[in-house]
Amino acid sequence: MHTLIERLEKVTNSKELEEARLNALGKKGVFADKFNQLKNLNGEEKNAFAKEIHHYKQAFEKAFELKKKAIMELELEERLKKEKIDVSLFNAIKTSSSHPLNYTKNKIIEFFTPLGYKLEIGSLVEDDFHNFSALNLPPYHPARDMQDTFYFKDHKLLRTHTSPVQIHTMQEQTPPIKMICLGETFRCDYDLTHTPMFHQIEGLVVDQKGNIRFTHLKGVIEDFLHYFFGGVKLRWRSSFFPFTEPSAEVDISCVFCKQEGCRVCSHTGWLEVLGCGMVNNAVFEAIGYENVSGFAFGMGIERLAMLTCQINDLRSFFETDLRVLESF
């Protein structure tokens, strides 16, 4: 049993220490074997041998605790040396990425501004004329029900789309006009694909009658969608908007399933991304324009961001969950 303590003194790490403990104190260790031998002894011989075993066992346990403490201190010192931090080193500041909505806005602006489109900014609070009537949406028009919004006592309202900026621009400027506007809009909706506040981008081009045709609109839209989404397929569908005539909606091939069919595209292989059309003459008449033509288009910025970031719940953009926002 003297050799147990001698072996313990040669231990240099935690693994060897545990092996020495099991060899001495384990169920099949040296001391367990010695205690089993007591059943073969009788009388004084048994008592003397039992005292001797206890003596060496206590001596080993004491030596083990001392060795354990020494090894723990040694390993801690070695670990601290390896993990030592030089406080004089420059601490790199963690840089965050752009919010998905800001990234989408900037990408849109980067496409249109080199083409001569001027970025216009409008008020969030509008009157009925600029938000509805001037856009061929007279009182009690059924299309107003789709744009239920927040009203104030003085007949003002939070704008339901960015189209009022087009009206203000035409009132303040004369053709030719090339403009885009981006900003917040408000409607009484809240679900997976709608929030009470959301962002839109709209574009308007106006010039002398005959200078602007639907083919110009088609070229701009197709160039933008290929720039934004890459090599997607496009599908044009006739539609209706009170402020454009003719009107169209544009779909892109599903970026999730590559037109194989999935829940996002309702197994059609297509995703709606924007609406557009030639500006309705009723809009020009409300402004006082004569002998002009033009086109307009609009799309939801959240919609574009959801498709590029592959997000199913629009509300994720506004919940300030860093785990979500830092994943883009």
Curated annotation (Swiss-Prot):
Which Pfam families has this protein been placed in?
A: Phe_tRNA-synt_N, tRNA-synt_2d
The record's subcellular locations are: Cytoplasm
Q: Does the record's keyword annotation contain Protein biosynthesis?
A: yes
Cofactor: binding comment: Binds 2 magnesium ions per tetramer.
Could you state a single Gene Ontology molecular function term?
phenylalanine-tRNA ligase activity
Cofactor(s) annotated in UniProt: Mg(2+)
Q: What Gene3D superfamilies is this protein classified in?
A: Bira Bifunctional Protein, Domain 2 (3.30.930.10)
Q: What is its main location?
A: cytoplasm
Q: What are the GO BP annotations of this UniProt entry?
A: phenylalanyl-tRNA aminoacylation
* GO terms under cellular component: cytoplasm
Q: What is its EC number?
A: 6.1.1.20
Residues that hold Mg(2+) according to the record? E245
- Quote the subunit structure annotation: Tetramer of two alpha and two beta subunits.
Q: Which PANTHER family match?
A: PHENYLALANINE--TRNA LIGASE, MITOCHONDRIAL, PHENYLALANYL-TRNA SYNTHETASE
Task: Cite the NCBIfam families for this sequence.
Answer: pheS
- Family that this chain belongs to: Belongs to the class-II aminoacyl-tRNA synthetase family. Phe-tRNA synthetase alpha subunit type 1 subfamily.
Q: Quote the protein name from its UniProt record.
A: Phenylalanine--tRNA ligase alpha subunit
**What species was this sequence derived from?**
Helicobacter pylori (strain J99 / ATCC 700824)
